[in-house]
């Protein structure tokens, strides 16, 4: 998604972008298109039962916007705090010598491979379906449009290789994926986008994710 940094003319904004076509109280957006019939259509496509992990591993050097961090810590019981200490050893607590490991994460949740809730972006002070920020933001989250309000996603997926259709291994910084780009990339596949489909775009930037440290963290996080 491109975020336009230039001033937006008032006439560029459709005045009736809310209420949603799915209803004034809707919090799921286009996921409403994943009907039971759509799920059945999707599962009938399965032939080999292969499972592909689309997520990147979270670690402290992952590409991120400035100010966002991910840290993971492991702590053990007090006998094992410092394994190089002269008193460190395998002895635990009690007659069965119990030891343990505790994991602690300190992170900005808007990082890595994830699915945004519809409360993430706003136009001015209004979110999806026209909800006002002042009405939904509370001390510990939002009372509407959180990721918990979205249904589970089981549907047909389409991978659109826009990097290849642009003639390269990855898009250039600043490239915007347009409808025409998507149509061009789809033309050679014989597929079209149907209501309820999950559309994934291959931009090529994921190939730089594992650089340690990332060569261009800002652009990798952006694209």
What are these regions (language model features)?
Residues 1-223:
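Active-/binding-site microenvironments in catalytic and ligand-binding cores
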């Amino acid at each position: 998604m491109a975020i336009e940094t230039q001033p937006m003319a008032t006439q560029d904004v459709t005045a009736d972008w809310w209420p949603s076509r799915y209803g004034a109280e809707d919090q799921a957006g286009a996921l409403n298109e994943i009907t039971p019939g759509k799920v059945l259509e999707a599962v009938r496509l399965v032939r080999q039962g292969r499972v592909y992990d689309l997520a990147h591993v979270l670690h402290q050097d992952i590409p991120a916007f400035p100010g966002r961090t991910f840290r993971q810590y492991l702590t053990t019981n007090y006998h094992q705090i410092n394994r190089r200490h002269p008193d460190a050893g395998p002895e635990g607590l009690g007659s069965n010598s119990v030891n343990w490991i505790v994991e602690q994460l300190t992170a900005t949740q808007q990082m890595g491979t994830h699915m945004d809730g519809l409360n993430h972006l706003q136009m001015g002070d209004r979110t999806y379906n026209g909800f006002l920020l002042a009405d939904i933001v509370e001390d510990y989250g939002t009372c509407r449009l959180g990721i918990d309000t979205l249904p589970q996603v089981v549907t047909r997926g389409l991978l659109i290789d826009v990097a290849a259709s642009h003639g390269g291994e990855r898009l250039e910084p600043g490239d915007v994926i347009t409808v025409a780009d998507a149509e061009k990339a789809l033309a050679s596949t014989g597929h079209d986008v149907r209501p309820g489909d999950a559309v994934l775009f291959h931009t090529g930037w994921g190939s730089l994710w594992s650089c340690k440290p990332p060569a261009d963290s800002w652009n990798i996080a952006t694209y």
